[in-house]
Amino acid sequence: MNKKILATAVLGTGALSTLFAHQAEASTTHTVRSGESLWSISHHYGITVSKLKSLNGLSSNLIFPNQVLKVSGSSNYSSRSNYGNSSSTYTVRAGDSLSSIASRYGTTYRHIMNLNGLNSFLIFPGQQLKVSGSVSSNSHSSYNSNSGGSSSTYTVRYGDSLSSIASRYGTTYQHIMRLNGLNNFFIYPGQKLRVSGSASSNTYSTRSAQSTYYSSPVFNHRNLYDWGQCTWHVFNRRAAIGKGISTYWWNANNWDNAAARDGYRIDGNPTVGSIAQSDAGYYGHVAFVERVNSNGSILVSEMNFSASPGILTYRTIPAYQVRNYKFIH
């Protein structure tokens, strides 16, 4: 009888040891849930945000649901100068950013931009990106000085940039910008671009005078806005262009007042990178201005407007509706 009890006790001790070992092993990673931040995860595991970022090679505070993070152990991201020679591609999903993709593949967003000839942070769901390999020398081929006399157009496809299109047609991205009256590098799939010919003198519309020397405040908070909401998206887009905003402006209908208190310029003139803000609805709405068109309309990116939270969408706001918004610069 005593032997049986002793055997059971030994067996129980062994089972508990195995259980604790599995629990310890399981606790080395954490799957991000909706609403979590690096701060809340690091606090839960008793480590610092810096340590958590180091363990996962994160260059920003951006994380996304279902992302698997290391929460203990040593960092494998100490040396990243060599990204390997094998080529690999990734299909962009809603909510992705260059930083989050780079983190997943153990590289940097700059390397991905170089691999794909990107000259802005804008990516689209369904877009194919190279995430490893070497930057091919022909992606930086020299441009021909002859832009041709006949007019020609090109339809933008996923992954295109002004530089890659210019290289294909033997011209420069500056010439394409002049031909199409572009004042920034933003282009989108399906857009028609002139790629040869002469720029007409009326290509550039007269814009209202704005201060060239305005410099908005910059915050470096973590994103505490609810995941997938319009406020969450705009916070991330501003951070991506180096113009971080406060994480304490609360609902969108309070953003204009809160931004003004923090020293931001608020007016009715949209500019690329500004925040379109509206008090309409119970919580209001904010969107990120991606492009200001020559006809006065604007293209914005947003979440939780015409789709579910977390789904990135684009919308053109007609010129006659632009006056319904305030713009935070």
UniProtKB/Swiss-Prot annotation:
It is found in: Secreted; Cell surface. Residues 1-26 form the signal peptide. It comes from the Bacteria. One of its GO terms (biological process) is cell wall organization. It is an enzyme of class 3 (hydrolase). PROSITE patterns: CHAP, LYSM. SUPFAM superfamilies: Cysteine proteinases (SSF54001), LysM domain (SSF54106). GO terms for molecular function: lytic endotransglycosylase activity; N-acetylmuramoyl-L-alanine amidase activity. CDD domains: LysM. One of its GO terms (cellular component) is cell surface. Gene3D superfamilies: endopeptidase domain like (from Nostoc punctiforme), LysM domain. Residues 205-329 form the Peptidase C51 domain. Residues 28-71, 88-131, 152-195 form the LysM domain. Keywords: Antimicrobial, Bacteriolytic enzyme, Cell cycle, Cell division, Cell wall biogenesis/degradation, Hydrolase, Repeat, Secreted, Septation, Signal, Virulence. Its EC number is 3.5.1.28. Its main location: secreted. It catalyses: Hydrolyzes the link between N-acetylmuramoyl residues and L-amino acid residues in certain cell-wall glycopeptides. InterPro entries: CHAP_dom, LysM_dom, LysM_dom_sf, Papain-like_cys_pep_sf. It holds the Pfam family CHAP. Peptidoglycan hydrolase involved in the splitting of the septum during cell division. This is N-acetylmuramoyl-L-alanine amidase sle1.
